[in-house]
């Protein structure tokens, strides 16, 4: 349960429900550079609906710009996190309302995911360069704010994860687009296990586009701020210069890479389990199997299918449309709310998943998470 405790601490800590503070995202213009600061350091800059509402108009303004007419630098406030996830507790709290109370407020389960995914797509189609600096934890919803932009910078302090299977959910915010496109089946491995990548390994895996040592970050930011022609090519050249200056001996990414590529390229979750069980003398295989057996079986099965389908979809927008469908079906099932209960509410770190085993989940049940929504609820771009 150590992994579940990590998720609890880094996603749900100190999340407030319906904040309207305009100070939760701060903007500063320096020349052609727009600096964006995610400003909830006590909550590890966890993304909430208010922050989505603040960010969306800014990205809408940029739709008509051309490459080179500006550059965005996004960071998290404080020294611990870029953005450690999303406001999942608020969705749980909405579920606990009675029907009369629900009738007096918006369905946050629909509204939050719909607006968040719209923002994710705006970031992914933004014509100007965005540089996201992973100054600490970068997880879940924070990945949706950054990975679809042109550039992501890892530092020694970066900790990346998509830990959603551990809370009975799935790798959303465009996870079905970027994860299957990582080399060596590493995206499938990260999606199913929620494993963390640290420092230079975030770059080696392909999540970050560059690695820059902490000692060079201030100079990097200053050069981007002073850039008079911030085309994607120019910004890439600046980033590459500081990347080349930076030294890192961290390369755990390559540990077990052959086994990850082989095992997580199998045709089913059951086959992945079987292959891990065959590696009796591998501590990595034992720990990986232990992790997979601790997370939601439903999440495992759905995420596996999500990665397979996402690999074939032509665009981020199509992946987000699929993910919105999946998100709403998850909110009709028990595991997400049980995961949040166990990690954030009762904090017993002992979720009771239903069904409790992958052997009790057939393809028909998996397919039900991908069915079109009724009553014109579909997200369409």
From Swiss-Prot:
Write out the GO MF terms: 3-hydroxyisobutyryl-CoA hydrolase activity
Write the Enzyme Commission number(s) for this entry. 3.1.2.4
Q: Which GO terms describe its cellular component?
A: mitochondrion
Keywords attached to this Swiss-Prot or TrEMBL record, sorted alphabetically, are: Branched-chain amino acid catabolism, Hydrolase, Mitochondrion, Transit peptide
Q: A Pfam family matched by this chain, by name? A: ECH_2
| Alphabetical list of InterPro entries matching this protein | ClpP/crotonase-like_dom_sf, ECH_dom, HIBYL-CoA-H
Grouped into one coarse class, the protein's main location is mitochondrion
What domain of life is recorded for the organism? Eukaryota
Q: Which PANTHER family match?
A: 3-HYDROXYISOBUTYRYL-COA HYDROLASE, MITOCHONDRIAL (PTHR43176:SF3), 3-HYDROXYISOBUTYRYL-COA HYDROLASE-RELATED (PTHR43176)
Xref: NCBIfam families: PRK05617.1 (NF004127)
**Protein name, please?**
3-hydroxyisobutyryl-CoA hydrolase, mitochondrial
- Gene that codes for this? hibch
